[in-house]
Amino acid sequence: MKIFDGHTDIMADVVTRRKAGEKNVVKTHHLHKLEKGGVEGANFVLWMDPEASAWEDVELGMAFIHDELRDSPDVFHHIKDIEDLVCDKNNAKIDIILGMEGLAAMGSSIERLKWLYEQGVRCASLTWNEANDLATGISGDAKRGLTSDGIQVVKTMEKWGILLDVSHLNETTFWEVAGMATKPFMASHSNAYTLCEHPRNLKDEQLLAVKDSGGLVGVNAVADFLHPEKPDIMHFVQQVDYMVELLGIDHVALGFDFCDFLHLDQQKEPEDRHVTTSLETSMDIQNVIKILEKKGYRHEDMAKLTKDNFIRVYRHHLK
């Protein structure tokens, strides 16, 4: 079963390694994992620490990303419009939709948002947990939501065709976004709070609001969002089952958010890391597929879950 991963931070690794002089980072370090997992497309997002990154860092990061794309035309098919979405990949291995995980560095500048759009960014979250000039994430003041500038950015994103990701928003901001959205939005890498009470997870009412927008929720494999003690692949499967029961198959997808390659020089020893057993990297994705198929998920439902739901939502946004 071929997979569209709703959230990967591989581009953060691309930027880090290219700063150090490497080239062909995805081919060297990631492609074998993606191929083993059956990943043929993903939202490849650029994340930068909102407390330590300036706009110039975003510009440099995007330059490195486009260098990577140009150096590997046999790997990447960059989707920027509806024609790209539906056309053949011309033998490239991976469909890539560029995204931003947080917009803190752009301040409130619509001109900078336009620049990101021109760079090919087609999905974005307003914040990565923090409070910024646009909105408030889960670590910010619970009573603070969208700013007036944030409202304009949401409207502009919808107008231009940038899919809004609500995964890191606090509840106040979430509900303000839900109340003003006129197109489907997504929680690309979020789980159900009912099954795991973590502030990054969404309560049932929020999940239903995503559904009501016509959007989707991508189930997340990060250990902390699955179980507080001993998360494993079955906790991930339970999240899928729960959301399918609550939302229907048309509004559930996969947004794994694998972190095995991040901060490699600072990682703890494997036995000390809090990981999701049997679902640690892209290479493990087919383990999930096999379990879901054994549970009786039909082929057409699996197709929606693994790729088609994302395609449907992007059809509402791409020009």
Residue ranges and their predicted role:
Residues 1-4, 8-220, 224-226, 239-244, ...:
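Extended, charged catalytic domains and RNA/DNA-binding interfaces, predominantly
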Residues 28, 55, 59, 233, ...:
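Electropositive phosphate-/nucleotide-binding environments in soluble metabolic enzymes
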